[in-house]
Amino acid sequence: MLVLLAFIIAFHITSAALLFIATVDNAWWVGDEFFADVWRICTNNTNCTVINDSFQEYSTLQAVQATMILSTILCCIAFFIFVLQLFRLKQGERFVLTSIIQLMSCLCVMIAASIYTDRREDIHDKNAKFYPVTREGSYGYSYILAWVAFACTFISGMMYLILRKRK
């Protein structure tokens, strides 16, 4: 049981770390001479422009920002609730509250990555002065980490739903 508990805790912390890196790091769309994410655009590795309200489709990027932040926060809250439930639940009960919050985190990261996937081309086309060389880019590792975090939070949420507290 102790090994299972250690695995679940490590898996949850890994999920939270993936969410944090995907949210903060600047590599959602990358190319040879640039990298961009939902916070800023950098060309030549030195010239960075912060995305603000003068940006076309800013509300779309704000939706991605908000859902990624919310996903990270919910994942952390789920971890703390799991730790509390370890000491509070009676033997044989399930970690339903932890599961629900973790699955909400999963839903938020899925929404963020889906919005970015769907709207990326429009964002780049409408902001050509900010994205002069982005046609030759591809999805970066932060974007991929967001989708990996989606899978991890989903699996984690389902584990909590199935898991029962034992002695």
UniProtKB/Swiss-Prot annotation:
Expressed in ciliary body epithelia, sclera, cornea, and retinal pigment epithelium (at protein level). Expressed in lung and endometrial tissue; expression is particularly abundant in secretory endometrium (at protein level). Expressed in placental villous syncytiotrophoblasts and cytotrophoblasts and on the membrane of interstitial trophoblasts (at protein level). It comes from the Eukaryota. One of its GO terms (molecular function) is integrin binding. GO terms for cellular component: apical part of cell; apical plasma membrane; cell surface; cytoplasm; cytoplasmic vesicle; Golgi apparatus; Golgi membrane; membrane. Disulfide bonds: none annotated. GO terms for biological process: actin filament organization; actin-mediated cell contraction; apoptotic process; bleb assembly; blood vessel endothelial cell migration; cell adhesion; cell-matrix adhesion; early endosome to late endosome transport. The chain crosses the membrane at residues 1-21, 67-87, 95-115, 143-163. Coiled coil: none annotated. PROSITE patterns: PMP22_1, PMP22_2. Pfam families: PMP22_Claudin (PF00822). It is found in: Golgi apparatus membrane; Cell membrane; Apical cell membrane; Membrane raft. InterPro entries: EMP-2, PMP-22/EMP/MP20-like, PMP22/EMP/MP20/Claudin, PMP22_EMP_MP20. Keywords: Cell membrane, Cytoplasm, Disease variant, Glycoprotein, Golgi apparatus, Membrane, Nucleus, Transmembrane, Transmembrane helix. Glycans are attached at residues 44, 47, 52. Gene3D superfamilies: 1.20.140.150. It is a multi-pass membrane protein. Functions as a key regulator of cell membrane composition by regulating protein surface expression. Also, plays a role in regulation of processes including cell migration, cell proliferation, cell contraction and cell adhesion. Regulates transepithelial migration of neutrophils into the alveolar lumen, potentially via mediation of cell surface expression of adhesion markers and lipid raft formation. Negatively regulates caveolae formation by reducing CAV1 expression and CAV1 amount by increasing lysosomal degradation. Belongs to the PMP-22/EMP/MP20 family. Interacts with PTK2; regulates PTK2 activation and localization. Interacts with ITGB3; regulates the levels of the heterodimer ITGA5-ITGB3 integrin surface expression. Interacts with P2RX7 (via C-terminus). Interacts with ITGB1; the interaction may be direct or indirect and ITGB1 has a heterodimer form. It is linked to Nephrotic syndrome 10: A form of nephrotic syndrome, a renal disease clinically characterized by focal segmental glomerulosclerosis, progressive renal failure, severe proteinuria, hypoalbuminemia, hyperlipidemia and edema. NPHS10 is a steroid-sensitive form characterized by onset in childhood and remission without end-stage kidney disease. This is Epithelial membrane protein 2. The gene is EMP2.
